[in-house]
Amino acid sequence: MYCLLKAAGYSDDDIILIIEDDIAYNSVNPQPGVVRVSDGGPNLREGAVVDYRTSSLTTDDLCDIFLGRCSDRLPCVLDSSQGDNVLVFWSGHGSPGDDGGSGCLNWSSDEELSADAAGELLREASSEGRFRKMLWLIEACYSGGVGQVSEGVPGVLCITAADPYETSKADVWSTALQVWMSNRFTSTLHESIASNPEISLRDLYYRLFINTVGSHVMIYNTANYGSLYSETLGEYLALP
């Protein structure tokens, strides 16, 4: 997603990149400094400007970043207003709730963003007028639990790789490296946007749904967002 935004013309000042950044120079990486999601694909780490590493942030810090609360520890925050469209891509691990749904997004070994906390964050951002529209694209197990809490928040749309009760699956296998490199949700997302940056949200959801294997791609809060047939990714990828 970072590369797609850069290709669309956005500067690093318009992007907040939070990753652990523990792959490129990992001792077992046969190509130091290189991160790919397919054999022979481009080096996604090259030129990337990392704002924060996940291990350096708490989930409270994450909420402060979303709500524009700048500090010495958090110099880079979301400086948005009610006229801005905000795109969030989250790829990681998730856990189920006690009842199998409405779980959490794992943040670190000892921290997580619960569905309830995510819902509170969305409602607070909405009440403070921090976005015109906000699109969440979440690739994580049980991510539908977080998607559910977006219901009722005006202008928020959430598309998840799995429903609240199931895991999402890896898909892109490297025979050379003997590791899973990506997943069908993310690879389809990238291919769909790269081939048509103005793709409608309906068509994007449909492509994700039919191509993602092993889990059910879900979409939440459509009634409070707008027409999925006329609303497009162009609202997020086209420079103002």
Task: Locate the predicted segments by residue.
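Cysteine endopeptidase catalytic domains of the caspase/legumain-like
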Residues: 1-240
